[in-house]
Amino acid sequence: MLSLIEQIKSGKLWDFPGGIHPFENKHQSNRQPIINASIPNELVLPLKQHIGKAGDLLVKVGDRVLKGQPLTQYTSTFMLPIHAPTSGVISAIEPRTVAHPSGLSELCIVLTPDQQEEWFELQPQPDFQQLTPETLLELIRQAGISGMGGAGFPTAKKLQSGLSRTEILIINAAECEPYITADDVLMRQYAHEIIQGIEIVEHILKPKLTIIGIEDNKPEAVAALQQAAQDKPMVIRVIPTKYPSGGEKQLIKILTNLEVPKGGIPADIGLMVQNVGSLQAIARAIVHGEPLIRRVVTLTGDCFRKPRNVWALLGTPVQALLNEFGYKADKKLPRLIMGGPMMGFTLPHAQVPITKTANCILAPTRNELTSSDNEMACIRCGQCAEACPVSLLPQQLQWHAKAEEFDKCEELDLKDCIECGACAYVCPSEIPLVQYYRQAKAEIRTRSLEAEAAERAKARFEEKKARMERDKAERENRFKQAAEDRRKEMQQQGGSDAIAAAIERVKAQKAQLEPTDNSVKPAIAAAIARAKAKQAEAAQSGASEPDNSEMAKLREERKRQARERKAQKGEVTEASTSDGADDKKSAVAAAIARAKARKAEQQETESAAQPAQATPSSDDADPKKAAVAAAIARAKARKAEQQETESTAQPAQATPSSDDADPKKAAVAAAIARAKARKAEKQETESAAQPTQATPSSDDADPKKAAVAAAIARAKARKAEQQETESAAQPTQATPSSDDADPKKAAVAAAIARAKARKAAQQSSSNLNAEEKD
């Protein structure tokens, strides 16, 4: 059985599934040789013209640069530098619209040419056989070369992935896209440089076989390559014209019958594929030292007066090429397509710049390429599935992409779609399937990047949390170790812990204060007991307001004790902090303490000896105020006695309806009333005698105020006596309000009157105190 390499050398070819045969229309632009386009007035250079990351800027606005001078630098293998296509001045660094299906804007360097074409210093390496593969890869990377067939993957990175494992090197010269002839004309005119580029790549990868795959619709290019590759160990294989045979996986299938595994790359199966445009750029970079600053662009379509291929400087606005090469827009449907009719996209405007992956500008008329705006519903014919070269299910992919069910799209291997457009070409409903796939891929890519960013943020947070916990544990261990070391050191020195010593000192000071606190507790308890007794007595006697005199005394006692404790604490603190105080200060402090103790003992004795019948404001009362209060109380007692006498005299005048009244009950009630009156008079006499024993609480009371208060009290007493006399004269004229009056009711009324008299006396006393305070 022949090996794979032997089968390839024998001329055997295979085929891939699906595929179509669209109208090629390549003859418009391949009959003219390549010419140089003029230098435009402005060059717009996007920082990112490849798959990967943009390089770091090396220039600023206002700098003058030379032709071939690096404008950015790379710091990773997925970065590529860009170079100045001509000499001039950097006029701006700003976002501009770039070649993208969505018309996105990216950061660009705007260069104003000076038309001098002054070159930067070049470093050619014509004897590349003496250089190592690593050195050659570095030179290729420095030249900024990427895949020029349309993908734009960094060439050096791709070659690096195939080091030491590439068995077959495949040169992609198929150029299957209709209208595009850039590679065809390049092979005709620069076949020698293409072969040089192949030899450089062979020196890097050292493959067992190199095979060039080219479609049979390029006979002139085949002849040029055969002539340039004479006596070279290369196989030039002409393959049938079929779209998309120029796809990497499809060309591998045709030439080797091998399939790239899902999610893998050709290097995984020992293969490496390179485009002829990339190889020509490699030869210029190594042999001549020129970086990638220009490329071949096909200008085709019926809107061009003379379609052809041109060398266009990178960054040249499309409008400059249109103006130079006779473009005349269609009046009803002006369109500019970057790329071919199958895989290209419509430009938003003509100021988009030429980049490393821009191989064609197609300007068709409305009759040449019809618009695809007439989308209709899918009729489920299945032609898209038959035409798919990757054996996908375009119909179901479109359904899920339209419904934004991107997880289903991934399950159906949407990422394997090469966006060749074969499905859309055969669709009778004119559904733009590729547009749905591109949008779905972009959304999936965006979500994937967001998920990766979230995972990175989560990992950073967890690492930070673990680090903080670790630092906290280390700090605690350090503190514990330091405390342990201190403790051991003090034990070794025969001392004790300073903190423990401080605690002991505080406890000792507290113990010194406790006896004083305990000595005053009995006095407080006695005062509380007296206050509770007076409250109980007031409740039994029916008083409406409780006697709070004892509580006032208790509050004063607590304040005094707090002041004494504060003074004692200050004395103890001063004694502990100033050990060198003299004997005089100590004697003075002791005398003050003894005086305060005697004063407290005297106050406790006085509060204990004070009678329980004292009025609520007896501690603060003035002797004159007490006399006034006694006079008021006597007047009210006389008034109450008169009312009782009237109430006992009324039963005799009652109507005949009270025949059941008992004379004995009336006599008993009268006796009770007289006894209560005598008791009230006795209490008044005692209260008048008490002022001499009361301790005045205010030494600054004004005698004039007391005299005024006494006069007011006498006036009120006279008014009360007059009212009593008038009320005593009216009973004979009064009409009894109740025919069933009972002597018991009269007694109850007398008791109520006495209670009201006592309440009025208390209120008048409190009012006098309030006026005195004011």
From Swiss-Prot:
GO CC annotation terms, alphabetical: plasma membrane
Localization, UniProt: Cell inner membrane
The 4Fe-4S ferredoxin-type domain, residue ranges: 368-398, 408-437
EC number, as in UniProt: 7.-.-.-
Pfam families, per the entry: Complex1_51K, Fer4_7, RnfC_N, SLBB
Listed Low complexity bias regions: 533-545, 605-618
Cell membrane in keyword set: yes
Keyword entries, A-Z: 4Fe-4S, Cell inner membrane, Cell membrane, Electron transport, Iron, Iron-sulfur, Membrane, Metal-binding, Repeat, Translocase, Transport
Binding site for [4Fe-4S] cluster 1: C378, C381, C384, C427
Binding residue positions for [4Fe-4S] cluster 2: C388, C417, C420, C423
Comp. bias intervals (Basic and acidic residues): 459-490, 550-572
UniProt subunit comment: The complex is composed of six subunits: RnfA, RnfB, RnfC, RnfD, RnfE and RnfG.
Family statement drawn from the similarity comment of this UniProt entry: Belongs to the 4Fe4S bacterial-type ferredoxin family. RnfC subfamily.
Name by which UniProt lists this protein: Ion-translocating oxidoreductase complex subunit C
